[in-house]
Amino acid sequence: MIVSRTLILIDPSSPHGEGGLHVLSDDDQAVTLLLTLDGGSARSLRDFAKAEDIDVSMAGLIYLDQVVNRVSVHTDDIETISTSGSDTVGEIFHVLQHRPVSRVILPASLPGLTGGGLGRLLHACPVPVLVAPRAQAGPAPFRIAS
């Protein structure tokens, strides 16, 4: 049986970047986390990679592993995707073409989804799109672990 997934975009550069995790419901039994490694949302990952002398893709994997630990209290079916593209909307549509997705959840802070980008997504997306509210208090942006 193919399980329909909830696609959640993550923004490690903002305290609101994991807002999508806070709106998961009991209906979201399978989750796909999408992280873009280029553009404004990856700024803190690039800083971490430089400080640790590792590739930004490795920094992304470390960050996604931390997010998976936070999501795992909700579901065991968690998939992670990191992309090198800076076109967030294009990356969402690419995932939608290859995975059974029932809805898309975006953080309110995600760069690249202002103006035309968000409008294009809302107009053309075949599944519901939810913009998660900004968190009152939540996880801080991705920080370098000491």
Where are these regions (language model features)?
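Short beta->alpha connector loops
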Residues: 12-16, 84-88, 110-112
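General small-molecule cofactor/ligand-binding pocket signal
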Residues: 32-34, 79-84, 130-132
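Glycine-rich, Arg-bearing micro-motifs that act as flexible, cationic patches
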Residues: 103-125, 138-141
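Structural beta-alpha unit
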Residues: 1, 72-104, 146
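Short, aromatic/basic amphipathic alpha-helical patches
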Residues: 48-51, 66-71, 114-124
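Small/aliphatic-rich secondary-structure junction motif
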Residues: 2-49, 124, 134-135, 145
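A short acidic, glycine-rich active-site loop
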Residues: 50-62
